[in-house]
Amino acid sequence: MTAVGGSPPTRRCPATEDRAPATVATPSSTDPTASRAVSWWSVHEYVAPTLAAAVEWPMAGTPAWCDLDDTDPVKWAAICDAARHWALRVETCQAASAEASRDVSAAADWPAVSREIQRRRDAYIRRVVV
């Protein structure tokens, strides 16, 4: 997300020759019209071969994961699994948000509510200050 009048979000990571620089703008942050819809199934299909090859892995970020060598494919499998979980979480949150939006939309006659608010706006009632 971009703060009002602010710059796009950045990712911070240790900068080394084999890694991305410390600050990288994400594609969606540079194109405000880009879709933010997340597909768990697409992520699952992409990471499935990596996870199948690793068979088992520790959860990303745990001490067991931190102890793995950076070149160990099991460490990468844990990252892929975390990405898959993140995609599932975001997709389900997006679906719930869309459902809530539809529920709110159907909850009232919103044009009538707007007209009523506009009608009341013209009324001025002088208050007595005590």
Curated annotation (Swiss-Prot):
It comes from the Bacteria. Residues 1-34 are annotated as: Disordered. Pfam families: DUF2742. To M.tuberculosis Rv1583c. This is Uncharacterized protein MT2733. The lineage of its organism: Bacteria, Bacillati, Actinomycetota, Actinomycetes, Mycobacteriales.
